[in-house]
Amino acid sequence: MIRQRTLKNTIRATGVGLHSGEKVYLTLKPAPVDTGIVFRRADLDPVVEIPARAANVGETTMSTTLVNGDVKVDTVEHLLSAMAGLGIDNAYVELSASEVPIMDGSAGPFVFLIQSAGLEEQDAAKKFIRILREVTVEEGDKRATFLPFEGFKVSFEIDFDHPVLKGQTQSAVVDFSSTSFVKEVSRARTFGFMRDIEYLRKHNLALGGSVENAIVVDETGVLNEDGLRSEDEFVKHKILDAIGDLYLLGNSLIGEFKGYKSGHALNNQLLRKLIAETDAWEVVTFEDASTAPISYMRPVAAV
């Protein structure tokens, strides 16, 4: 049987919030079967919990924000992408501030943290959401779609009217039956344009942003000394974001996601539409792992 997974051990890290610029302590903890991923604002008394579910998404400007009343957790998508990529079903994410630390702008440091904590299989079947028919949302020329597919595939196309991105690969397809999330997607960093930074900072966004945790682009090129990690890093990061946003369904997906210029807002609209259209999906488990269209790396022992 494909089993649910949690962390073997508790692990901690420190970083800064991309948008808030605040120092934040992050603690990842094991959680019981059927808990899901739950964020905890440990700096508040009493502690406030926010389950990582599509219905709890509040703000989607520049990142995905979860809310519970007037309490929020910003920029959850990169950590959730790492959880999805490693097949973690159940975990507590404790934070000392209102934003997940940005680390290096990718999911790579979170993958390392989770692997360092070790993965533990639990005594319950992992639940997948299988897409049964097409579901699409559109906004202007932006589009996000779910399609049936025996496995998990993400295809994405971006179209930035910017001289630097015009010369870069702007579309990618990742079929996770043959491609490793860790190798192909997890290290793609978030990116930002110099021309937008003044506006963002005026609106209290990107206060913690720098070439240490983002690809920074001006009209002539990439400002990061070491350049890009891959020529398709921009579009691969959009795939990373989408995987994190999609994990707000609360389960791993069996299906295909297609995004055209989609972002956090449209991704969330697609999830809400899918959840509402109950004939478009079903929950499945696999007693025999060999019959499953998706496989996960074997749990690694904690280092």
UniProtKB/Swiss-Prot annotation:
- Provide the cofactor list for this protein: Zn(2+)
List the InterPro entries.
Answer: Ribosomal_Su5_D2-typ_SF (IPR020568), UDP-acyl_GlcNac_deAcase (IPR004463), UDP-acyl_GlcNac_deAcase_C (IPR011334), UDP-acyl_N-AcGlcN_deAcase_N (IPR015870)
**What residues sit in the active site?**
264
Task: Quote the cellular component terms of the Gene Ontology held in the record.
Answer: membrane
Q: Tell me one GO molecular function of this protein.
A: metal ion binding
Keyword Hydrolase part of the UniProt annotation = yes
Q: Which UniProt keywords apply?
A: Hydrolase, Lipid A biosynthesis, Lipid biosynthesis, Lipid metabolism, Metal-binding, Zinc
A GO biological process this protein is involved in? lipid A biosynthetic process
The answer, when asked if Zinc is one of the entry's keywords, is: yes
Q: Show the catalytic activity.
A: a UDP-3-O-[(3R)-3-hydroxyacyl]-N-acetyl-alpha-D-glucosamine + H2O = a UDP-3-O-[(3R)-3-hydroxyacyl]-alpha-D-glucosamine + acetate
The residues that the entry says bind Zn(2+) are 78, 237, 241
> What pathway annotation does it carry?
Glycolipid biosynthesis; lipid IV(A) biosynthesis; lipid IV(A) from (3R)-3-hydroxytetradecanoyl-[acyl-carrier-protein] and UDP-N-acetyl-alpha-D-glucosamine: step 2/6
Query: What are its E.C. numbers?
Result: 3.5.1.108
Q: Which domain of life is it from?
A: Bacteria
- What role does this protein play? Catalyzes the hydrolysis of UDP-3-O-myristoyl-N-acetylglucosamine to form UDP-3-O-myristoylglucosamine and acetate, the committed step in lipid A biosynthesis.
Family membership? Belongs to the LpxC family.
* Annotated PANTHER family: UDP-3-O-ACYL-N-ACETYLGLUCOSAMINE DEACETYLASE 1, MITOCHONDRIAL-RELATED
What is this protein called in UniProt? UDP-3-O-acyl-N-acetylglucosamine deacetylase
